[in-house]
């Protein structure tokens, strides 16, 4: 290149061009790309006045305007990227420069839209005001009970007949399209309306569309003339029927969450009952158990009516000594039958309190736990169990490996934030094994904690409900614990839950037997069906391959009719669940959770259905470390197999599109879209299997609370605690303070009206943000520190409301990014024998994505550049 430029260009220009070429090479560009980049630069200088001030402003804003194009490392097709991005920017700039009449028209539309949203927001209050008289007087109150039942029966009968006609009426494609547009229009109108009416209306619309779909599938889409198509079609129909049943039961379960609030306790503390607190442990480290015991010691309850027990199934001397030192009771069994359930039942022989509260050994209760829960027991004598959420202050494997901790609701948020609240409406709250209070009398009547299944908690609540006792759920977190540290441990825990729920289904089926109300039966069945999702999920992940590889018509219908039935079913279900579950489960994330677990829960649930007594109990490990980032190849092996299988389907689909019958082209396209969606979800599952580093033994909890620090010379400075752990704190000093790294200071924290002092050492200083390391504490100081931090009554209450609102399209984009991230990890960590395949695939996707225009990264100087760009 230097010889050619020396011959064509004058020395100063040649030297500058050679310098630019070397700069490109230094930043990683290939020789070809660097040479081509220099050539494009020469053409730009010839045809574009780059020295003009407007072009200079654009060049200064290059990173903001062209964020995906690296000016220091050119690529061969960068001019195409510049052209696409420039057109994108010009379209955006022209929108801002619209003529005044258009701007006024647009403003008018915005005004109409704003008034519509305001009207929708005010509608529930208006309806409530107009119908207030109905709350004071029943319209049919003058009729006898029999007449009212007759009228209600007639209304229900006619409603069912109309629903049946609506579901079963056959439509041609045009009529089906018009019908769907009407329903979709209604859904768009009511979805922004606050209150429960809009959710109920969306449920009705979703059920209408989904029931029409499942009716159409059973009556019009099976190919009875082709055995292969029939078998594959029936397998898919089985999975879809399962999904439809779970959808219907799920709507029923959460249609009206109760949102129970605390009941005040009597002022006379002599009326407060006695409570035993059980903390069962088996193989956990003492450091995991200490915080739970320390927090239990600080629970606001009369000390003469509170007994704390360590139930040590490991029989360890250090635990017995610890219990003696802090003044709690200790029980160790000589035999270990029935695992945790047997451990608790053994302790029930010694505890004599009127109530028993159970905490897993890593669940730290707040000081207000009993005061928030016990009032309901005094109000309702038939109440046997009160459950509170399982809240976790450490990230679970999904949150940690994907970097989503406190950014996206975790896997358990839906159950503890919404499902249990919905169960409470139907008096079907499940006992979850921890963070709960149980009345001793009903517990003794059923023989203690159930031992026949490995999910003793749910089985115990089922037995209590069969006896006619009630249960309750309070959504306010009153304890927090450690999430599982690795994906393998997380999957092991879910396997146990899945097998246990299927065992209950076989051994004590809630659909049969006495004592349960109809609504309770449905709630229990839905919980058990949830854990049978493994096989249906695997079917969905492989179903389109039946057509691409086996030429089996799994849905024997024209592609247009498939689109007119399948897409509305999926869209309405997604829209409705986003409205109902948005705070607790973002759209499309259920696909990731179920895909990760599907392969592993399918075999044990199938075995439990056949032989419910087969299997063993496993204990979930807590408090471990992940010292290096790595791919769990054992766990991810099934996902990789499914990825490869779907890639084969893609290859065959491409061949069939170009060389297959023209009449099948649209069906091939539909199947390929399904395969690509499955590949995205499987890529997300692979991304979860990449274990991120976890090198902290003490997890940091982000929380703001006032504090103060005192230097050794007596100077006192106010500060705000930003995060804390069992080993230290992060604080922000209010104002100026001379704090040096390594300096010893005292930290002052308040609990109620009492102030506590803790010795610390400054570990780091960054401006007014300071990291403090706790110095060795006495036992009493450690108890006080836990009660001032982890056990504060307000520590966890606001976490559930901190998640952003669900936006389905943004959530879909997150899943797309997550899937691509999984394949990048495969390319990075894969063995050399297959690394090349994934590198080629990820490079190909990255290359295609690099041409997509980006939204400019705004800065204060970006606006003039946009205007300059529009004027060129």
From Swiss-Prot:
InterPro entries referenced in this protein's UniProt entry, alphabetically: Cell_synth_A, Glyco_trans_2-like, Glycosyltr_2/OpgH_subfam, Nucleotide-diphossugar_trans, PilZ_domain
Cofactor(s) demanded: Mg(2+)
Active site: 313, 457
Induction / repression: Part of the yhjR-bcsQABZC operon. Expressed at low levels in mid-log phase, expression increases as cells enter stationary phase, the increase in stationary phase is dependent on rpoS. Expression is higher at 28 than 37 degrees Celsius (at protein level).
Keyword Magnesium part of the UniProt annotation: no
Region (Catalytic subdomain B), start-end ranges: 441-501
Disruption phenotype: When disrupted in a cellulose-synthesizing strain (a strain K12 / W3110 derivative called AR3110 with a restored, functional bcsQ gene), cellulose is no longer made and the rdar morphotype is lost.
Description of how activity is regulated: Activated by bis-(3'-5') cyclic diguanylic acid (c-di-GMP).
UniProt cross-references to NCBIfam families, sorted A to Z: CelA, PRK11498.1
Protein's UniProt name: Cellulose synthase catalytic subunit [UDP-forming]
Species: Escherichia coli (strain K12)
Lineage: Bacteria, Pseudomonadati, Pseudomonadota, Gammaproteobacteria, Enterobacterales
